[in-house]
Amino acid sequence: MSPVPLKNAEPAHGGVRTVSVLGATGSIGDSTMDLIRAEPERYQVEALTGNANVAGLAKLAKEFSARFVAVADPARLGELRAALAGTDVACGAGESAVIEAAARPADWVMAAISGAAGLKPALAAVDRGTTVALANKECLVCAGDFFMSRATAAGAQILPADSEHNALFQALASGNRHELTRVIITASGGPFRTWAAADIEQATLAQALKHPNWSMGQKITIDSASMMNKGLEVIEASYLFALSPDEIDVLVHPQSIVHGLVEFADRSVVAQLGAPDMRIPIAHCLGFPDRITGRAAKLDLAKIGQLTFEAPDFTRFPGLRLAYDALRTGNGATTVYNAANEVAVAAFIAQKIRFGAIARLVEDTLNSWVRAGNQAPLGSADDAIALDQQARNLAATLLPQIAAKAS
């Protein structure tokens, strides 16, 4: 018998796996479809959804013989029907159709609709008790306790599809909950990692969009520059793995090769490494509990040469500190944190505020909301969506005075 404890079992999913991809025309959806495209004999596409890219959605539906597709924009239904004419693909439009797509019978669902619009469809998939690969931050940041309780009640399995939480998910398998001492989420540090605070304050949009490692959308790239994205990931990790804020650390790692680490009681630290390519965590989710053939480049540590680490600076990047504050406040504070940040980032993109004012608007919104005494547990998706809108309105009200201070 080999002393190496490697499994030699038959694949857990030997047959064809039915899959649905919510947000199929976005960046996460594109990576997911790329993996499915590589091994089409393993998958049957049940449902696909998109926001407004009808041509892209119809093209995917035809390529993968999807059974149902939905476009979020109800005004695009006629266009979608025309694009699918002559096929057997059923289609719909609007929120109800997207939720219908999520609730259809599939073994595996990728929940990659961005924003609060992704919450109800993800819940529809969860309620079926299926396996859900979660790439929507709002499900956890805005409704974490409620979302995870609902998943547990339905018997659904939640697989984290983003790189950091997927890394933690893999590393956590090395031990038991009572043996865990902390998890460590890594951050690239973004384009302003070495900048002085005064320079960060005045950073331009073009500078904020120059991420050193990842190719991402505009909003998440700005969040990386402010380290708000890492704050959101701390919040997600807390809900996803039932961890206290004190059990979650952040470590700046400029090379973005080590994505997450877990420390156990015996002081062993287990880490997951990989190239900065979203197809790696998505492939882990798509094959789980088996491993499928990846599409990303192999990791060449000799070529990379060195891996470096440093502590985060909570003074130059206050958005990270605010995430911990929101977690400790609870009762909807993380929802407010996320909503205020979205308003602030939109204002920065529109050149209404300086980069440094993003965190100030988030902090002022949180403080104002706490002073109003409106904190309460969120008991439903509608509660989370209502608080999200309330927080956006509050942030918008505070925005002019933040902008005036910066001028």
UniProtKB/Swiss-Prot annotation:
InterPro entries: DXP_reductoisomerase, DXP_reductoisomerase_C, DXP_reductoisomerase_N, DXPR_C, DXPR_C_sf, NAD(P)-bd_dom_sf
The protein's required cofactors: Mg(2+); Mn(2+)
The protein's annotated pathway: Isoprenoid biosynthesis; isopentenyl diphosphate biosynthesis via DXP pathway; isopentenyl diphosphate from 1-deoxy-D-xylulose 5-phosphate: step 1/6
Statement: the UniProt record of this protein carries the keyword Metal-binding: yes
PANTHER family: 1-DEOXY-D-XYLULOSE 5-PHOSPHATE REDUCTOISOMERASE, 1-DEOXY-D-XYLULOSE 5-PHOSPHATE REDUCTOISOMERASE, CHLOROPLASTIC
Protein name, UniProt field: 1-deoxy-D-xylulose 5-phosphate reductoisomerase
Residues binding 1-deoxy-D-xylulose 5-phosphate, per UniProt: 137, 163-164, 188, 211, 224, 229-230, 233
SUPFAM superfamilies noted in UniProt: 1-deoxy-D-xylulose-5-phosphate reductoisomerase, C-terminal domain, Glyceraldehyde-3-phosphate dehydrogenase-like, C-terminal domain, NAD(P)-binding Rossmann-fold domains
Family per similarity comment: Belongs to the DXR family.
Keyword vocabulary terms for this entry: Isoprene biosynthesis, Manganese, Metal-binding, NADP, Oxidoreductase
EC numbers on record: 1.1.1.267
Gene name of this polypeptide: dxr
Domain of life of the organism encoding this protein: Bacteria
Pfam families referenced in this protein's UniProt entry, alphabetically: DXP_redisom_C (PF08436), DXP_reductoisom (PF02670), DXPR_C (PF13288)
GO terms assigned for molecular function: 1-deoxy-D-xylulose-5-phosphate reductoisomerase activity; manganese ion binding; NADPH binding
Lineage: Bacteria, Pseudomonadati, Pseudomonadota, Alphaproteobacteria, Hyphomicrobiales
GO BP terms, alphabetized: isopentenyl diphosphate biosynthetic process, methylerythritol 4-phosphate pathway involved in terpenoid biosynthetic process
